[in-house]
């Protein structure tokens, strides 16, 4: 049986996507609607403490297109912490005007294909630890999509020898490293947690970089032969300064 590579796992991850029920929200008096948005802002402010105390983080983005209107991504030390985060959000007044469109449960993951043998605790490595327990960038744009490694009669990633998978992942990683400084990437593993095997979350100040990296990787053997993808969600950051504009009517 082919050898399964070890993974390094960090914070648990929850992507929540919603459509806004504008028709219902439009019926709410202006003063009451302002109270609803203020409560949402208080919620977001409160959870910035997780970032400050380094026990998690979150990102909030306005999604482009009709698949969703907002994306809320939360990272926490334990899965039950994600439940608490989601439950608290669902009890906000704004939740009465949100329609869930998609969610994704996973965990920050670093593949160990290329790791050498070492007695060092990787969780204490100053280069690895911030990638497992990250402070999320406040980039202008986000791109999220789930994916699988293909497994069928012709191409089955999981039946490849470890050495071949290592070779392919090395070449795959070289492409990603060319976008250092342009894109910040987070891989979350979801085998046993959700319908796909991984989630990919990209941050950039220029959304064109999302197209460039995904297109270039289409020609990489790892993706061309073994990659299957779900829906792509792209959006612009929601900050304290533009939250009011998002819900303005």
Curated annotation (Swiss-Prot):
It catalyses: Fe-coproporphyrin III + 2 H2O2 + 2 H(+) = heme b + 2 CO2 + 4 H2O; Fe-coproporphyrin III + H2O2 + H(+) = harderoheme III + CO2 + 2 H2O; harderoheme III + H2O2 + H(+) = heme b + CO2 + 2 H2O. One of its GO terms (biological process) is heme B biosynthetic process. Keywords: Heme, Heme biosynthesis, Iron, Metal-binding, Oxidoreductase. Its EC number is 1.3.98.5. The active site is at 145. Pathway: Porphyrin-containing compound metabolism; protoheme biosynthesis. Belongs to the ChdC family. Type 1 subfamily. Fe-coproporphyrin III acts both as a substrate and a redox cofactor. This is Coproheme decarboxylase. It comes from Staphylococcus saprophyticus subsp. saprophyticus (strain ATCC 15305 / DSM 20229 / NCIMB 8711 / NCTC 7292 / S-41). It is an enzyme of class 1 (oxidoreductase). SUPFAM superfamilies: Dimeric alpha+beta barrel (SSF54909). The lineage of its organism: Bacteria, Bacillati, Bacillota, Bacilli, Bacillales. Its cofactor is Fe-coproporphyrin III. Involved in coproporphyrin-dependent heme b biosynthesis. Catalyzes the decarboxylation of Fe-coproporphyrin III (coproheme) to heme b (protoheme IX), the last step of the pathway. The reaction occurs in a stepwise manner with a three-propionate intermediate. GO terms for molecular function: heme binding; metal ion binding; oxidoreductase activity, acting on the CH-CH group of donors, oxygen as acceptor; peroxidase activity. NCBIfam families: PRK12276.1. The gene is chdC. Fe-coproporphyrin III binds at residues 131, 145-149, 172, 185.
């Amino acid at each position: 049986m082919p050898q399964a590579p070890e993974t390094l796992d960090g914070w648990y991850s929850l992507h929540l996507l919603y459509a806004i029920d504008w028709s219902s929200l439009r019926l709410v008096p202006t003063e009451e609607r302002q109270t609803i948005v203020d409560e949402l802002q208080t919620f977001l402010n409160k959870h910035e403490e997780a970032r400050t105390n380094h026990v998690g983080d979150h990102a909030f983005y306005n999604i482009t297109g009709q698949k969703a209107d907002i994306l809320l991504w939360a990272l926490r030390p334990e899965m039950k912490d994600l439940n608490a985060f989601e439950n608290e959000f669902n009890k906000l007044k704004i939740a009465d005007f949100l329609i869930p469109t998609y969610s994704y449960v996973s965990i920050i993951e670093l593949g160990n294909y290329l790791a050498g043998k070492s007695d060092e605790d990787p969780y204490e490595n100053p280069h690895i630890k911030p990638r497992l327990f990250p402070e999320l960038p406040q980039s202008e744009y986000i791109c999220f999509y789930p994916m699988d490694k293909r497994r069928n009669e012709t191409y089955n990633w999981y039946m490849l020898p470890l050495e071949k998978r290592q070779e392919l992942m090395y070449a795959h990683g070289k492409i990603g490293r060319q976008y250092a400084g342009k894109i910040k990437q987070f891989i979350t593993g979801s085998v046993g947690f959700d319908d796909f095997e991984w989630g990919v979350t990209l941050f950039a100040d220029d959304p064109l970089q999302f197209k460039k990296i995904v297109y270039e990787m289409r020609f990489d053997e790892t993706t061309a032969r073994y990659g299957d993808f779900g829906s792509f969600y792209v959006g612009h950051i929601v900050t304290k300064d533009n939250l009011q504009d998002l819900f303005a009517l």
